[in-house]
Regions:
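Non-cytosolic beta-sheet module surface loops
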Residues: 9-10, 57-58, 85, 129, ...
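Active-site-proximal loop/turn and secondary-structure-junction residues that shape catalytic pockets
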Residues: 23, 33, 70-72, 98-100, ...
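Extracellular beta-rich repeat passengers
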Residues: 118-195
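All-beta strand scaffolds that present successive hydrophobic residues in beta-strands
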Residues: 4-7, 27-31, 51-55, 76-82, ...
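Short glycine/acidic-rich loop motifs that flank beta-strands on beta-rich extracellular proteins
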Residues: 15-21, 37-47, 51, 59-70, ...
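Conserved beta-strand/loop scaffold segments within soluble protein domains that form the structured core
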Residues: 14, 68, 74, 80-82, ...
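Internal alpha/beta core interface subdomains
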Residues: 1-33
């Protein structure tokens, strides 16, 4: 698909990933509200797509809110998630991975995001990689976190998992975290690993 606009919709109680954009170019998603209470009810998954802007989103989901993956449908490049509010009952709020089956996953930005709830031990900002892609130029900027008892602030790792298919593992480089503010009452642990 090319030149796609998705605006002003509500997705309620999906039984799988609520919105999956796969193998597309030049996509704009805005003013979307997503409510999911089932396992696997991700918010928005951008998979092997290029030039995608996701803005002004509210998610309250049981699984991951914003995810970038590459499922063998081409490189994933120039993706921005911005100006959004995330509530997670389980899993990750912002994630690059786990499935990264492409040559390049690069220039991915998460900017001006409010995390208002996440009460599991999962990382709020994660990069999990076990396939062959070169992952680079990932930015988490201007992120505000309200309460996230037990959550990890961020987790970056290269490791094998049940979701990976490639035998060779790629690398991760040029990751930026800036203007991250935690205003909750819980001291979250911080995990950085490269396994």
């Amino acid at each position: 698909c090319k030149n796609v606009t998705i605006k002003g919709i509500i997705i309620d109680d999906s039984n799988d990933w609520s919105m999956r954009i796969t193998g597309c170019d030049d996509v704009n998603i805005s003013d979307v509200k997503i409510f999911g209470c089932r396992g696997n009810s991700d918010g928005i998954d951008i998979c092997g797509s290029r030039n995608v802007t996701v803005s002004d989103i509210f998610t309250r989901v049981w699984d991951d809110s914003f995810v970038v993956k590459a499922l063998g449908t081409g490189n994933c490049e120039n993706i921005i998630f911005k100006n959004s509010v995330l509530w997670n009952d389980f899993a990750r709020t912002m994630e690059v991975g786990v499935e990264l089956r492409a040559d390049k996953v690069r220039n991915i930005k998460f900017e001006n995001i409010d995390i208002i709830h996440s009460d599991t031990g999962y990382p709020l900002m994660g990069i999990h990689h076990g396939d062959h892609a070169r992952v680079s130029d990932i930015t988490f900027k201007n992120i505000r976190i309200e309460d996230a008892p037990g959550a990890q602030l961020f987790d970056i790792r290269i490791a094998d998992s049940v979701w990976n298919r490639d035998k060779a593992m790629g690398d991760i480089r040029n990751i930026t975290f800036s203007d991250i503010e935690y205003i909750g009452t819980n001291d979250s642990g911080i995990l950085l690993s490269n396994s």
